[in-house]
Amino acid sequence: MQIFVKTLTGKTITLEVESSDTIDNVKAKIQDKEGIPPDQQRLIFAGKQLEDGRTLADYNIQKESTLHLVLRLRGGIIEPSLMALARKYNQAKMICRKCYARLHPRAVNCRKKKCGHSNQLRPKKKIK
């Protein structure tokens, strides 16, 4: 039977499959056509993410059904020098005691009108 796989870019891929094929097999066929590794693929049908070990019949996927392909997001750690820079950028600030505006580290007066450009500033509290 024939099914369609729609990507986020709007491209539609046509696959020739059997209802007894597993989701793993479908992902392998997508890899053959598009070059996307199966571990980065997520297939969605009827609002549900399809699990690798199950078959197309388990999800009641019939001929000319459309699956949606999205890519798995990968997280990662930040390099230590970039982490220090991010921490400095996010934590080295002054806070107005009247209106709680965040200001640059060397600020003397608040930039907001609602507190009358107050000079009552404090350093931003450090995250523990």
From Swiss-Prot:
Matching CDD domains: Ubl_ubiquitin (cd01803)
UniProt-listed InterPro entries: Ribosomal_eL40_dom, Ribosomal_eL40_sf, Ribosomal_zn-bd, Ubiquitin-like_dom, Ubiquitin-like_domsf, Ubiquitin_CS, Ubiquitin_dom, Ubiquitin_ubiquitin-like
Domain of life per record: Eukaryota
GO molecular function terms noted in the UniProt entry: mRNA binding; structural constituent of ribosome
Domain Ubiquitin-like: 1-76
GO cellular component terms given for this protein: cytoplasm; nucleus; ribonucleoprotein complex; ribosome
KW Nucleus (keyword) present: yes
Cross-link type Glycyl lysine isopeptide (Gly-Lys) (interchain with K-? in acceptor proteins), residue numbers: 76
Keyword field: Cytoplasm, Isopeptide bond, Nucleus, Ribonucleoprotein, Ribosomal protein
GO biological process: one example: translation
Gene3D superfamilies: 4.10.1060.50, Phosphatidylinositol 3-kinase Catalytic Subunit, Chain A, domain 1
Transmembrane domains' residue ranges: none
Keyword Ribonucleoprotein: yes
General remark: Ubiquitin is generally synthesized as a polyubiquitin precursor with tandem head to tail repeats. Often, there are one to three additional amino acids after the last repeat, removed in the mature protein. Alternatively, ubiquitin extension protein is synthesized as a single copy of ubiquitin fused to a ribosomal protein (either eL40 or eS31) or to an ubiquitin-related protein (either RUB1 or RUB2). Following translation, extension protein is cleaved from ubiquitin.
Membership in a protein family: In the N-terminal section; belongs to the ubiquitin family. In the C-terminal section; belongs to the eukaryotic ribosomal protein eL40 family.
Name of the protein this chain belongs to: Ubiquitin-ribosomal protein eL40 fusion protein
Biological source species: Brassica rapa subsp. pekinensis
